[in-house]
Curated annotation (Swiss-Prot):
Keywords in alphabetical order: Repeat, WD repeat
GO biological process, one term: autophagosome assembly
Annotated region (Disordered), positions in chain: 95-128
Top-rank taxon, per record: Eukaryota
Organism of this sequence: Dictyostelium discoideum
Keyword field contains Repeat: yes
Family label: Belongs to the WD repeat tipD family.
GO CC, alphabetical: Atg12-Atg5-Atg16 complex; autophagosome membrane; extracellular matrix; phagophore assembly site membrane
UniProt protein name: Protein tipD
WD repeats: 322-361, 364-403, 406-444, 447-486, 490-530, 535-576, 582-611
InterPro entries according to UniProt: ATG16, Autophagy-rel_prot_16_dom, G-protein_beta_WD-40_rep, WD40/YVTN_repeat-like_dom_sf, WD40_repeat_CS, WD40_repeat_dom_sf, WD40_rpt
Keyword Repeat tagged: yes
General function of this protein: Not known; disruption of the gene for tipD results in morphological defects.
GO function terms (MF aspect): Atg8-family ligase activity; protein-membrane adaptor activity
Length: 612
């Protein structure tokens, strides 16, 4: 009975998925690890199977020797049982034979004495054999009992080991859960580290912006210090001259009073003599003006008369080097007598258009100036820079009034809404509106693409149009900060400039890297006219097109140094100006003055050309 229990226990152990015993090795009957099936399973299933096989290997190695011993004991038990049964059968047969011999039949008394004696001898020999067999049987029963005891001990050990294995499995599962939790915590910590690294990078960028601004302010401060010294010296000289002139005027006034008193006294006595003395005294009172070299007299430029028809340029009149590096932008003031240019030498230069002489240099930027514009009253100049800031200078004095910081990318464009408000567009995909009286940003508009240029629509400044790197023109309500219209397919290349029509407030002109210019009606958002020419190639991301003040012509510079001029009314090419700018030097900007009688262009090779 105990043997059958052990056999059923072995069947339970072998059939329950723990393992089978075969040639002293332990194998899992559940998981197949053949090469063909293993390679056909996806990677995550392979990992699970590999982990289960590792677990089975770890769990079976501890019991393989024990199971082998247990199997040997079972075999010995079966052998002993077979031998015991055999001996028991022999004993039974011997006992039966002995009983038969002890009770002979009735005819047996007639046997002879010799056969009786031989039978008794054989019975006595068999009795000794039976005793030996009984002793062996007793021994075998003892061995069998001991084997049962050992099997019972082994079974209890197996149960204990199973319990221990379950505990270890539970502990392993808890450890795996803990490991998974720790992994999740580590991943969260890594994500936090990445976020903190991004914050650190952002803070470093802000710090770099502040350092650049500090450097520019220090440069501006040193420049202003030298200007202050010069102005103080000039002021002292002017005060001295003013006092001297006041003293001279006072002395002349005293002489005039004395003369008047004398004339009153002599009026009645000798009228003729008094008239002669009066004429002599008046001639003595004539004040000789000081020489022009002694007293600086401000030069007032002749503004000229507005021409109803814009000049069509044909040849170069003047040519000069504008900057120490390539030129990026230029702008006229409202009456056309001043021209501001910005370049890669980090400064804005103001030029007298009539004489072609430089009037002032505006400093403070730490990188290239990429956009300039005059305020409506011409008192200020706005310049935007690649140092992520925009600056405002006083036109007459050349002093910096404001430094507008807040963008985190290059500021590509800036325009005046009025004398106290400006708007800037940046590579950081934002448009910012600024209050110049308070000196800070009043609104930030997120435009989802780098802004290359923008214009103000209408006089109120509430509506804007901007051109972007993603080939789109966007129209904005600055009060809401939301786009009112997006023209995403207006061009096939990025927009390089947007210009208001000087004669029609409902039209704007766009220029693009797809080598075309287009007039857009801002009421219907339709393209009215497209301008292109085989010789026109827009070669720069900041190429600015120009509209003549009378609205008749449109001009833009090409990558080969030529300038194309179109008729705005029919889109036909009127003229192509060549062989003036260096061949291969892109013309970055060209413009008519507001008086329509001057046309100026600039290129990457630092040249400024005035046409006639």
């Amino acid at each position: 009975m105990f043997s059958s229990q052990n056999n059923s226990y072995m069947m339970m152990m072998g059939g329950g998925g723990i393992g089978n015993i075969n040639n002293n090795q332990f194998y899992s009957p559940i998981i197949s690890t053949s090469a063909q099936s293993f390679n056909s399973i996806v990677e995550w299933k392979r990992d699970i199977i590999r982990q289960l096989n590792d677990r089975n290997q770890n769990q079976t190695n501890n019991y393989s020797e024990f199971m082998r011993i247990y199997t040997d004991l079972l075999k010995r038990e079966r052998t002993l049982n077979d031998r015991t049964l055999l001996y028991e059968k022999e004993i039974v047969s011997l006992r039966n034979e002995k009983k038969t011999q002890q009770q002979p039949p009735s005819g047996s008394s007639k046997m002879d004495s010799s056969s009786s004696s031989s039978s008794s001898n054989r019975v006595s020999g068999m009795g000794s054999t039976i005793e030996e067999m009984e002793q062996k049987l007793f021994k075998l029963q003892e061995d069998l009992t001991n084997s049962y005891k050992r099997n019972a001990d082994n079974a209890s050990s197996i149960l204990l080991l199973n319990d221990k294995n379950k505990d270890l499995q539970n502990e392993l599962m808890s450890k795996e859960i803990e490991i998974e939790r720790i992994r999740s915590t580590i991943q969260q910590d890594l994500d936090s580290i990445k976020r903190l690294e991004m914050v650190v990078i952002e803070k470093e960028n802000v710090s770099q912006i502040i350092r650049d601004e500090l450097s520019s302010l220090q440069t501006e401060f040193l420049h202003n210090e030298s200007k202050v010294v010069k102005l103080e010296q000039e002021n002292s000289s002017l005060v001295e001259r003013w006092l001297r002139k006041k003293n001279e005027e006072a002395s002349k006034m005293n002489e005039a009073n004395d003369f008047y008193q004398k004339m009153v006294e002599q009026r009645d006595s000798t009228p003729a003599k008094a008239a002669v003395q009066l004429s002599e005294s008046i001639s003595n009172l004539v004040v000789k003006l000081p020489d022009a070299n002694d007293v600086p007299i401000p030069i007032v430029l002749e503004r000229g008369v507005f021409s109803s028809e814009a000049m069509l340029p044909s040849k170069a009149k003047k040519r000069w080097t504008g900057h120490n590096s390539e030129i990026y932008c230029m702008a006229f003031n409202s009456i056309g007598n001043l021209l501001a240019t910005g370049g890669g030498d980090k400064c804005v230069k103001v030029w007298d258009v009539i004489s072609g002489q430089q009037k002032s240099t505006l400093l403070g930027a730490s990188q290239s100036i990429v956009s300039v514009s005059f305020s409506p009253n011409d008192e200020s100049i706005l310049g935007t820079s690649n140092d992520n800031s925009a600056r405002l200078w006083n036109t007459e004095l050349g002093r910096s009034r404001h430094t507008l910081t807040g963008h985190i990318g290059k500021v590509y464009t800036g325009k005046f809404i009025n004398s106290n408000r400006v708007v800037t567009g940046s590579h950081d995909r934002t448009i910012k509106l600024w209050d110049l009286q308070k000196g800070y940003c009043t609104r930030t508009i997120f435009c989802f693409s780098s802004c290359n240029d923008l214009v103000i629509l209408g006089g109120s400044g509430t509506h804007l149009a901007s051109g972007h790197v993603d080939h789109s023109v966007r129209f904005w309500d600055s009060n809401a900060g939301e786009p009112t219209q997006v023209l995403s397919s207006i061009h096939e290349g990025q927009i390089t400039s947007i210009t208001n029509s000087p004669t029609n407030t409902n039209q704007i002109l766009t220029n693009s890297r797809d080598h075309t210019l287009k007039i857009i009606d801002i009421r219907t958002f339709d393209t009215i006219r497209t301008f292109k020419d085989p010789e026109y190639r827009n070669g720069l991301n900041w190429t600015k097109a120009s509209w003549s003040p009378d609205g008749r012509y449109i001009a833009s510079g090409s990558i080969d140094g030529s300038i194309c001029i179109w008729d705005a009314t029919n889109g036909k090419t009127v003229k192509v100006l060549t062989k003036v700018h260096n061949n291969g030097s892109s013309v970055c900007c060209c413009s008519w003055s507001p008086l329509a009688n001057i046309f100026i262009s600039a290129d990457k090779d630092k040249n400024i050309i005035q046409w006639e």
